[in-house]
Amino acid sequence: MAENRMSDGSDDRAAADPASAAALFDRARQRLGRAPREHLGRLIVPGALRAAMGARPRVVPDGRAWRVGTLLIGDTAVHEVGDVLRASEERRRGFTSDAARRRAEAEAMCVRGGFEPGTVVNVDHTGIDLSALAAEGASGPLSVRDGTVVIRWTSSGAVMPLEAYLREKIDMLPT
């Protein structure tokens, strides 16, 4: 019987079990170790009463995670990347488009929520349910194809095995 070892010493049978996605992320966390993490932010919209008294929407800290390609890997959770903002002070400026105006407003919400100007903040990230992946065969950009957990890593739908994706992306990160 042939041994099922991959080039990095891992067992390729683990990648065929959807429940093993959790184990792949655990190994990724160990490899990431001291790599820099980015902030996660959560949008808080004031209720009608607070808004009437002048409260404005803000983005507040909601943890930290390693950004690994299209994924945000936290200590216990995994998310799909949403919008990535750089917190900046609110100021009057000319805009060439409504999209630029909305982005500047979102960046100012980060400062109102407590982030230092210049801080990278990930907002609108979507949680990935690894138990749903095991039960239903898909969650977020992850799915199971032919018994292997794969990740959709481009908007056009390109996929690759999650284990190879994590290995490649982590190898490219600064440590």
Question: What residue ranges belong to the model's regions?
Answer:
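A composition-biased, non-transmembrane "mature-region" signal
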Residues: 1-4, 10-66, 84-91
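Generic alpha-helical propensity signal that fires on short helical segments
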Residues: 50, 89, 96-98, 167-171
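Low-complexity intrinsically disordered segments
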Residues: 2-31, 37, 110-175
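Aromatic- and glycine-enriched beta-alpha-beta binding-site module
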Residues: 60-111
